[in-house]
C-alpha cells in the first residue's frame, strides 16, 4: 500500500500512523515525542512512516491544548559573569517562547550559593511537577549521581550547561569547545608573540573543557617554537589569580605571553599593573563582560574569546522546546565554538544584540560520545 498522502487529502493523524504501522497510538505518541518504551528500530520505522505520510503537527493547536511546560533552572554559580550570562540567555529564550506555554522556574540565584543549597534545589525541582530541568553545575560532580533514580523514575529530561556530569542520566550536555578555544588562543599568541614562553591560567584542571583548552594551547604555540612554562589553577577567584601571578613572575621571569582561559582575569592583570609591567605582556583572555572589554579597548588585552554562555543558555531552552513540541531528541553532547573579539569589535559588542537566528545550527559542533570520552 502506498503510504504517501496526496495533496488535498485529509490531515494525517497519529491514528492513521498507528493503523498503518500496526501499533497502538500510545506507541506512536512515544515514538514521535522521543519518550521511552519504544525500541530504536521501531521508533525509526514510525518516524519514517510519519514522514512518508506527510504527518505534520498543528503546533498552534497543541500550544492551546496542552498544559504549561514547566522548566526548572538550577545554577550553582550565577553571581559571576559567565554564569549570569547563561541565566540571561535562558531568560531571553523563555521570553521568546512565552506564548508557547513554556515557563521557567528558577532555584536560588544568590551571590553565594552553597553546595547543599544547590543539591537541595535540584532535588526539589526533580521531585516537583517540573517537566524538565536545566542544570548549570560545577565540580565535584559525584554528589549529583544520587539523582539518577529520580530522573529515570520520572523520565524527566535534564540538560546540563557548560559542564558535563559523568554518569548522570541527562538528555543532553551543552559545553564550550575547550579544544577549539585553546587552539584559537594559541593561534592568536603565535601571531602577536611567536616563539615565546607562556603561562596559562584556568579555573581547574578537573573541568574537562578548561584542561583541554590549556593542553591545546600548548600544542598550538609549540608549532611556532613557543613553550608553556606553567598552568595555574585559580579556582575562578581573582584573589588566587593575583597570588599565582606573583608566583609566575618569581619562577618564570622569561614568560611574555599569558592566556587566561577563565572569566576572572582581573587578578592576573592587577598584579602585573602593581609592578607597572602589564604592557610587557601579550594577554589573551576569554569572555566579554564590561571589565574585559574596557581592558581590550585600552590595549592591555590583545584579544578575548567569547565562549558564548548567552547562547548556551538560549540553546538549552530551545532544545527542550523542540523535544516536547516536535519530539526531536538532541545529541548527547553539543560543543559551542568560541568567537574572537578584538578591540575594534569590542566598541560595539553587546551579547544581547547578537543575531540568534542561526543559534541551533550555526557553527555548533555535535560529537558522538565515543569521540569525546573524558
Regions found by a protein language model. Give the residues of each.
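N-terminal helix-turn-helix DNA-binding module of bacterial transcription factors
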Residues: 1-63, 67, 371-373
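Hinge/cleft segment of the Venus flytrap/periplasmic-binding protein
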Residues: 49, 219-221, 308-374
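Amphipathic helical "hinge" segments at domain boundaries
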Residues: 56-121
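Hinge/beta->alpha junction and helix N-cap segments in small-molecule ligand-binding domains
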Residues: 76-85, 106-117, 139, 174-184, ...
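Short, high-confidence coil segments that cap the C-terminus of an alpha-helix
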Residues: 130, 196, 252-255, 301
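Hydrophobic alpha-helical
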Residues: 132-152, 217, 233-293
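Flexible loop/hinge segments that line or gate small-molecule binding clefts
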Residues: 139-180, 289-301
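An alpha-beta-alpha
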Residues: 184-231, 320, 328, 332-347
